[in-house]
């Protein structure tokens, strides 16, 4: 495991020691190399997990998320180059250091064996994200957004610490790999119901479940491009990962405590999808679509069948790549028109035809068109929810329809129509941006050839 963590940490001195014209080249190439090394973790010969040490382990659930984390760092660096070009050198270096620090924490979170260390690292990811949002965001509302982000996440996850200490008293250990052999079910009592709520709340806020999702659109809209990418692609997946890990420990509470949250998520995914139809702000639309996709993941995790677990894992990976790509596209529009409003960026297809092709591909993967892995994830979730209760087919069908509607609405508003006068002289798309989109799109299409590596531990 250290062969990934230590090179990532060493990216920080590399950043500070690089010459002025070599910062971006060095960091991007080395982080790409790290992500290629991490691919070896996807090959899991044993049927349980790879234990590297007492601290770190990797199993078919954490390996894809870890590879996604390492894959996104070079992409974030590529996306950030333009809007940091006017910053002084020291701030560029600080920015890259923050991203690298965040990546280190995330890798360690996804591979931690022990619940308290998982909790500490889970909270540590908050600090670099907060600094990135509040320091490099575009508008002054970024401070407000940072405040929302901090308080929602902290208030949600404080009860988790108390719950973990009580689990420690109950079982004598907080090791993921040992607790799964703990055979005494939790008795039905009020204290255990509160224990379940405390454990779940932290991850529900992080996901976010509908009703606790208000920090997400704010944080997404105000964050700079790398902040949006890492927030949508990985920080939301921390919630799903934690839920997948901890629901199996808390049975039989989960089976009856899950009902209100299942209802809330099924309702919330329709609501947030409908909100998307009326958005004018491009980044806000993508943020709300993230909420509706994550609601599907919550439903899948709480149903607790092997099929739904497979769907949840596949959907998390697919959504990570898709939403990150959409944020990159929104950012390339923003850098040219200096506005996030969709109506002011209309008719770009005539001016940037290649970007229009990427927009089309990204919108189609967002609405889960075959052969993308989004379809695989959504099919598993829809089928498992249908076998859990037949009525959900109405809600699921409505959600899929509305998702298709707002994805196409986003595509048509930004690409078609007569272009406005203030974008007569815009720069053509750079090779950097096209490479960035290709690096997002290729995994989405290639994974559909061999989806078993992202189907999690129940495959």
Curated annotation (Swiss-Prot):
Positions of transmembrane segments: 22-42, 60-80, 95-112, 113-133, 147-167, 193-213, 224-244, 256-276, 284-303, 308-330, 351-371, 391-411
Topology versus the membrane: Multi-pass membrane protein
Keyword Electron transport annotated: yes
Keywords: Electron transport, Membrane, Mitochondrion, Mitochondrion inner membrane, NAD, Respiratory chain, Translocase, Transmembrane, Transmembrane helix, Transport, Ubiquinone
PANTHER family recorded: NADH-UBIQUINONE OXIDOREDUCTASE CHAIN 4
One Pfam match: Oxidored_q5_N
Subcellular locations according to the entry: Mitochondrion inner membrane
Stated family: Belongs to the complex I subunit 4 family.
Catalysed reaction, written as an equation: a ubiquinone + NADH + 5 H(+)(in) = a ubiquinol + NAD(+) + 4 H(+)(out)
Gene Ontology biological-process annotations: aerobic respiration; electron transport coupled proton transport; mitochondrial electron transport, NADH to ubiquinone; mitochondrial respiratory chain complex I assembly
The UniProt record lists the keyword Electron transport: yes
Gene encoding the protein: MT-ND4
GO molecular function: NADH dehydrogenase (ubiquinone) activity; ubiquinone binding
Predominant location category: mitochondrion
InterPro entries to which the protein is assigned, alphabetical: NADH4_N (IPR000260), NADH_Q_OxRdtase_chainM/4 (IPR010227), NADH_UbQ_OxRdtase (IPR003918), ND/Mrp_TM (IPR001750)
Protein name per the record: NADH-ubiquinone oxidoreductase chain 4
Species name: Equus caballus (Horse)
Highest taxon in the source lineage: Eukaryota
Enzyme Commission code(s) on record: 7.1.1.2
């Amino acid at each position: 495991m250290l062969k990934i963590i230590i090179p990532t940490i060493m990216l920080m001195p590399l950043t500070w020691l690089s010459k002025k014209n070599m910062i971006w080249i060095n960091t991007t190439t080395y982080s790409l190399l790290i992500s290629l090394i991490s691919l070896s973790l996807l090959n899991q010969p044993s049927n349980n997990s790879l234990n590297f040490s007492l601290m770190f382990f990797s199993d078919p659930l954490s390996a894809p998320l870890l590879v996604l984390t390492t894959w996104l760092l070079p992409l974030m660096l590529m996306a950030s180059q333009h809007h940091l070009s006017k910053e002084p050198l020291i701030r560029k270096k600080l920015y890259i250091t923050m991203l690298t620090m965040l990546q280190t924490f995330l890798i360690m979170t996804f591979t931690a064996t022990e619940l308290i260390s998982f909790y500490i690292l889970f909270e540590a990811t908050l600090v670099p994200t907060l600094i990135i949002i509040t320091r490099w965001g575009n508008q002054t509302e970024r401070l407000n957004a940072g405040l929302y982000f901090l308080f929602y996440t902290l208030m949600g996850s404080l009860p988790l610490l108390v719950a973990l200490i009580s689990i420690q008293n109950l079982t004598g250990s907080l090791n993921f790999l040992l607790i799964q052999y703990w055979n005494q079910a939790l008795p039905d009592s009020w204290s255990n119901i509160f224990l379940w709520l405390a454990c779940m709340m932290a991850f529900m806020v992080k996901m976010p479940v509908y009703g606790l999702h208000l920090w997400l659109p704010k944080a997404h809209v105000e964050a700079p491009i790398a902040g949006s990418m890492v927030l949508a692609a990985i920080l939301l997946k921390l919630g799903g990962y934690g839920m997948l890990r901890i629901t199996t420990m808390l049975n039989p509470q989960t089976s009856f405590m899950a009902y209100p949250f299942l209802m809330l998520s099924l309702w919330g995914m329709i609501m947030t999808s409908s909100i998307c139809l009326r958005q004018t702000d491009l980044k806000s639309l993508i943020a709300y679509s993230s909420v509706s996709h994550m609601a599907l993941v919550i439903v899948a995790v709480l149903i607790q069948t092997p099929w739904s677990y497979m769907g949840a894992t596949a959907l998390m990976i697919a959504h990570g790549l898709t939403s990150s790509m959409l944020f990159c596209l929104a950012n390339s529009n923003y850098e040219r028109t200096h506005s996030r409003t969709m109506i002011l960026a209309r008719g770009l297809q005539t001016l940037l035809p290649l970007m229009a092709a990427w927009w089309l591909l990204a919108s189609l993967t967002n609405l889960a068109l075959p052969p993308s892995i989004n379809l695989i994830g959504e099919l598993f979730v829809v089928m498992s929810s249908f076998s859990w209760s037949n009525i959900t087919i109405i809600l699921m069908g409505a959600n899929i329809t509305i998702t298709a509607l707002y994805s196409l609405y986003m595509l048509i508003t930004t690409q078609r129509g007569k272009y406005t006068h203030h974008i007569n002289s815009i720069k053509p798309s750079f090779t950097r941006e096209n490479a960035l989109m290709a690096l997002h799109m290729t995994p989405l299409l290639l994974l559909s050839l061999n989806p078993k590596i992202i189907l999690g531990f129940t495959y």
